[in-house]
């Protein structure tokens, strides 16, 4: 049987994909088949038994009362700050660059506090994946809902630009309960068992619809139909960083995807923050609609970076300082790590 080869298929791997497609037809969105395994391991494969044990442990932890979760998170965070030295050095480097006014002792304490906040955030996420979130949705302090109403009056969907604060999955239902048609952008976990656990836990609440970076077109359609999508885009994506804008006065690599999404879908863009307050309560803040968002990607990045910075300055331990936020550097700039 002859195989027609398009001119666009110029590489051997692409040609092999065509041959495999004729010999072994498959369904689904598959490409570059020669670079993938012929079949995925089933979730009960022995390679995933460790992940299943972890899921079982997390499920058991979800039954702990929230007060005990918070106390355990404090103990666990302090322990990890001493054991995970490489991540502690990353957090220290981030804080030294962003808050040079802090002395060494204060910065060291803030590193430990960031570990504690992150550990508590994991346990809060476990609660959100398996337990009832209604009491927290009802008791959380929420500000700026009128901006969501304004977007609705304009007949627009909403792109909610967020950040990686310590309450992350726990915050998803707190945000979604204020939305009529919620969705979110996410990066699938490399371990399929862990990914299934996380996604199942997220989708329990309010019919939230997930989108990956490979589902941009469906997400644009969802937004055009009045959907409201949460996108935490404040991490350093390495070579995918397209612009550099100030974050705490340091040039930070940013993607321009939010600008593209806003421009193509015509949505209203609103920044959102979600914090655990010192008294143990939770707070969600929606910003006013960011007018003209999507026209100038660099300016857009400055807007959402500025919003995140203002939030972090209020509760500095609540940010994910353990992430290498300044991994990408502008040409000629000194490395931070």
Residue ranges and their predicted role:
Residues 154-213, 236-246:
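Catalytic core of membrane glycerolipid acyltransferases/transacylases, capturing the structured
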């Amino acid at each position: 049987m002859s195989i027609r080869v398009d001119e666009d298929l110029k590489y051997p791997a692409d040609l092999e994909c065509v041959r495999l497609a004729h010999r072994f037809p498959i369904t689904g969105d598959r490409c570059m088949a020669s670079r993938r395994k012929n079949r995925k391991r089933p979730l009960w494969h022995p390679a995933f038994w460790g992940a299943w044990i972890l899921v079982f442990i997390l499920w058991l932890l979800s039954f702990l009362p929230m007060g005990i979760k918070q106390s355990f998170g404090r103990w666990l965070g302090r322990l990890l700050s001493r054991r995970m030295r490489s991540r502690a050095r990353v957090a220290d480097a981030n804080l030294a660059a962003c808050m040079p006014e802090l002395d060494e002792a204060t910065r060291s304490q803030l590193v430990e506090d960031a570990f504690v906040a992150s550990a508590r955030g994991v346990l809060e996420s476990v609660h959100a994946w398996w337990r009832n979130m209604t009491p927290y949705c009802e008791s959380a302090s929420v500000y700026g809902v009128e901006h969501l109403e304004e977007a609705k009056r304009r007949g627009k969907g909403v792109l909610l630009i967020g950040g990686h604060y310590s309450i992350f999955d726990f915050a998803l239902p707190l945000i979604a309960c204020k939305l009529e048609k919620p969705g979110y952008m996410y990066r699938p976990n490399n371990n399929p068992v862990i990914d299934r656990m996380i996604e199942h836990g997220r989708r329990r609440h309010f019919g939230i619809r997930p989108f990956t970076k490979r589902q941009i077109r469906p997400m644009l359609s969802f937004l055009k139909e009045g959907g409201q999508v949460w996108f935490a885009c404040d991490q350093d994506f390495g070579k995918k960083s397209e612009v550099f804008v100030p974050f705490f006065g340091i040039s930070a690599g940013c993607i321009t995807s939010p600008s593209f999404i806003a421009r193509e879908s015509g949505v209203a863009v609103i920044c959102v923050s979600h914090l655990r307050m010192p008294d143990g309560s939770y707070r969600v803040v929606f910003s006013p609609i960011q007018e003209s968002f999507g026209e100038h990607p660099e300016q857009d990045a400055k807007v959402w970076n500025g919003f995140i910075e203002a939030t972090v300055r209020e509760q500095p331990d609540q940010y994910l300082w353990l992430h290498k936020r300044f991994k990408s550097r502008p040409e000629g700039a000194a490395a931070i790590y």
